[in-house]
Amino acid sequence: MPLRLIFMGTPDFAVPTLLELAGHGHEIAAVYTRAPKPGGRRGLALVPTPIETEARRLGIPVVTPKTLKTEEALTAFRAHQADAAVVVAYGMILPQAILDAPKLGCYNLHASLLPRWRGAAPINRAIMAGDAETGVMVMKMDVGLDTGDVAMAERLPITDAMTASDLHDQLARIGADLMVRAMAALERGGLTLTKQADAGVTYAAKIEKAEARIDWSKPANAVLRHIHGLSPFPGAWSEVTLDGEAVRLKILRCALADGRGEPGAVINEQLTIACADGAVRVTELQRAGKGPMKAADFLRGTRVAPGLRFG
């Protein structure tokens, strides 16, 4: 018999899971998400979260509490009489009373192979650290930071070509399927939980804009990982002088390339930039106030001569 669920999520990453659960016949009693934020032109309109948009399209009641710590919030949560809650990038801490409210517990989809990369930015940090693989896990939540017992996991290799955006989209799709499988097992009474290992714990700190500047004095593979791990947001950037003007360019994609030179120096007309060892060839970038563009299109309108310095 399908489960009666509360779904709790906010960004695009959570949308595939909501759609898959609804599509597999589970009853979504309510969707909890963050409140709309000012946006649009001049920031005058209130913009709903991606999850709120999808929930309303599906006709599911939406709840946007400022906190879950009040007795009023707990009473409202309990009133849904859910079998379980599914939590995907909700963005708010769930107190123990909320975790205890659904009959079968609360289950979180986390975008890493726990206990590695607990915390806010597991996708970015996995790429930036040069991990060979990552994945998604379904865990039964406790009050700790991503410390709950693991129910299911799916692994995914990380290639040199993957950006955080690429990995985000793949893990969102894989994770949606994984959560559907987990809820099916929970429904049958056959969901097995395994404690996380004590060894190998790392934390994925929130990405700060201050760390986005590219350090060309690092090896080429580290520069590539930095660029791809921060693409598209906040976007790894570097400054260069074009037509006598200092310009900040976000570099969104690159590839390892042969070549040597002073770190930060352009070494050919294909926008290949030297690093401490080796080089990277820029394949996609973004100028301030402009949209992303292929490097080839950028070079058709802007001459970037060998010897030009990025820094």
Swiss-Prot record:
Q: Extract one GO molecular function annotation from the record.
A: methionyl-tRNA formyltransferase activity
Which top-level enzyme class is recorded in the Swiss-Prot or TrEMBL entry?
transferase
Which reaction(s) are listed as its catalytic activity? L-methionyl-tRNA(fMet) + (6R)-10-formyltetrahydrofolate = N-formyl-L-methionyl-tRNA(fMet) + (6S)-5,6,7,8-tetrahydrofolate + H(+)
Keywords, A to Z, come to: Protein biosynthesis, Transferase
Could you say which EC number(s) this protein's record lists? Answer: 2.1.2.9
One Gene Ontology cellular component: cytosol
Give the transmembrane region(s): none
* Cited InterPro entries: Fmt, Formyl_trans_C, Formyl_transf_N, Formyl_transf_N_sf, Formyl_transferase-like_C_sf, GART_AS, Met-tRNA-FMT_C, Met-tRNA-FMT_N
Q: According to the lineage, what is the superkingdom?
A: Bacteria
Q: Any idea which positions bind (6S)-5,6,7,8-tetrahydrofolate?
A: 112-115
Function field: Attaches a formyl group to the free amino group of methionyl-tRNA(fMet). The formyl group appears to play a dual role in the initiator identity of N-formylmethionyl-tRNA by promoting its recognition by IF2 and preventing the misappropriation of this tRNA by the elongation apparatus.
Regarding protein family, the annotation reads: Belongs to the Fmt family.
Full protein name: Methionyl-tRNA formyltransferase
Organism per entry: Bradyrhizobium sp. (strain BTAi1 / ATCC BAA-1182)
Q: Which gene encodes it?
A: fmt
